[in-house]
């Protein structure tokens, strides 16, 4: 869920990398 645009998006770098990997592999598992 995105935060308010005023505050800007909050995504941890390690979490972002996990998301990118999941998207690349088409993985549908929940990302922890």
UniProtKB/Swiss-Prot annotation:
GO terms for molecular function: rRNA binding; structural constituent of ribosome. It comes from the Bacteria. GO terms for cellular component: ribonucleoprotein complex; ribosome. Gene3D superfamilies: 30s Ribosomal Protein S19, Chain A. Keywords: Ribonucleoprotein, Ribosomal protein, RNA-binding, rRNA-binding. One of its GO terms (biological process) is translation. Belongs to the universal ribosomal protein uS19 family. Protein S19 forms a complex with S13 that binds strongly to the 16S ribosomal RNA. This is Small ribosomal subunit protein uS19. It comes from Yersinia enterocolitica.
């Amino acid at each position: 869920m995105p935060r308010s645009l005023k505050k800007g998006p909050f995504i941890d770098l390690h979490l972002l990398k996990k998301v990118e990997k999941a998207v690349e592999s088409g993985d549908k598992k929940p990302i922890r």
